[in-house]
A protein has these predicted regions:
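Residues forming anionic-ligand binding surfaces in small-molecule and nucleic-acid pockets
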Residues: 25-40, 86-91, 132-160, 260-270, ...
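A generic local secondary-structure boundary/capping motif
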Residues: 115-118, 140-143, 196, 228
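A glycine-rich phosphate-binding loop feature that marks nucleotide/adenosyl-phosphate handling sites
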Residues: 1-5, 35-41, 68-80, 125-135, ...
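A carboxyl-terminal module marker
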Residues: 10, 14, 68, 146, ...
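Beta-strand scaffold of nucleotide-dependent catalytic cores
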Residues: 15, 128-129, 138, 218-220
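Flexible glycine-/small-residue-rich
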Residues: 4-6, 92, 131, 155, ...
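Extended, well-folded interaction surfaces typified by the phenylalanyl-tRNA synthetase beta subunit core
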Residues: 1-124, 324-326, 331, 336-357
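Short, well-ordered loop/turn and helix-capping segments at boundaries between secondary-structure elements
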Residues: 27, 60, 111, 115, ...
Length: 357
């Protein structure tokens, strides 16, 4: 124990006692360098890095990020066909326009589309990363409402283009997943599925499903009532992705998908398959992809070209795919490619009675 004499009232803290010890020992005998200490960089925040990567990818695709309030008016919920009863209502709202916690981000984005079109922007895409609160999610261990993080986006074009807007947004979502090295499938929504979030149209939407079966989100067009309520153009589609589930699948796919460019030229072939009109395009693509996996020595990319259906015969359709071949060892010849095209045609004929035309 150390006792402080009564004539030293200046010693009040433990640091003063240490200073006295060094005074007796001699300050001149102190080592002239700083004491060693372990310095570690701050750990990376994986969630923050994922959000930044998403922002960069969507910005490169031409999308614009917006920030909106987490509180919305009840009118916004009703216009998007959402149930206000699922939203938490504030007892001391700052204004009537900020009464409810939003249960999804998409309505906040839809509310901004018409104003941008009136400002002269005919074609654009908006996205936002934010949190949602839904009574269906329940409470956490601290008895607080569970909040989830989503990335929602909407594409709008005042001047309609050929084809459906679904494919435009799906292409953007598909590219985003590919850049993040997350393999997904776009699965058709069953008629009996009642979990389709408003305001998506179940008949014109698809689930975004990871390879392990996790439902990451949804991409598709909106119901006509929501388009009418928000004064949206007909050529409008959107997507909504759960960032927490996306991060879980991202951690399982940490490997890089980089492949060095081949020194040899690529070559491509088209294949047209005539089949029953009830056969889904996804089955045709999966058939070609399965054949491609058997030939791992080649880099093969499959791109849809067209789906043709005669006006006078709606019982059949013709699907055309473009298959691109690349070898890292040599220049490919027709004798290398023709058997693979024939193999795709044979598998399609076996699985859904398709004929090569």
């Amino acid at each position: 124990l150390v006792y402080i004499p009564f004539w030293r009232p200046d010693i009040e803290r433990p640091e003063s006692i240490v200073g006295e010890g060094w005074r007796f020992y001699g300050f001149g005998r102190l080592l002239r360098h700083l004491p060693e200490r372990s310095i570690k960089p701050a750990p990376k925040n994986e969630r923050r890095e994922l959000k930044q990567r998403i922002r960069q990818r969507l910005s490169r695709a031409g999308a614009n990020e917006v920030l909106t309030y987490s509180f919305v008016h009840g009118r916004v919920l009703k216009n998007s066909e959402q149930d206000p009863g699922r939203a938490y209502r504030l007892s001391n709202a700052l204004s009537p326009d900020l009464q409810y916690y939003r249960i999804s981000i998409l309505p906040s984005l839809l509310d901004k589309v018409h104003a941008n079109i009136k400002s002269g922007h005919d074609e654009f895409m908006l996205f936002e990363i934010g949190k949602i609160h839904d009574k269906k999610l329940g409470f956490n261990d601290e008895n607080l409402p569970i909040e989830k993080t989503f990335i929602d986006g909407v594409y709008a074009n005042k001047k309609p283009k050929a084809g459906a807007p679904f494919y435009k947004v799906r292409k953007i979502a598909e590219r985003l997943m590919k850049d993040l090295s997350v393999e997904v499938d776009f699965v058709k929504i069953a008629e009996s599925d009642s979990d389709v979030p408003a305001p998506f149209d179940a008949k014109r939407s698809a689930w975004i499903v990871a390879k392990n079966g996790d439902n990451l989100g949804i991409v598709g067009e909106l119901v006509s009532s929501a388009r009418r309520n928000f004064k949206l153009p007909d050529y409008t589609a959107a997507f909504s992705i759960d960032i927490e589930k996306l991060q879980e699948n991202l951690s399982k796919n940490q490997g890089y998908n980089y492949q060095p460019l081949s020194r040899f030229p690529s070559t491509a072939r088209d294949i047209s398959l005539k089949m029953d009109s009830n056969v889904d395009y996804a089955k045709v693509y999966a058939c070609a992809e399965e054949v491609a996996k058997k030939h791992g020595e080649l880099q093969m990319s499959i791109t849809p070209i067209a789906i043709y259906q005669p006006k006078n015969n709606d019982s059949t359709k013709t699907v055309t795919l473009n298959v691109k071949f690349t070898s890292a060892e040599r220049t490919l010849e027709d004798k290398d490619i023709a058997p693979i095209i024939e193999e795709i045609a044979a598998m399609a004929a076996e699985e859904f009675d398709a004929a090569q035309v």
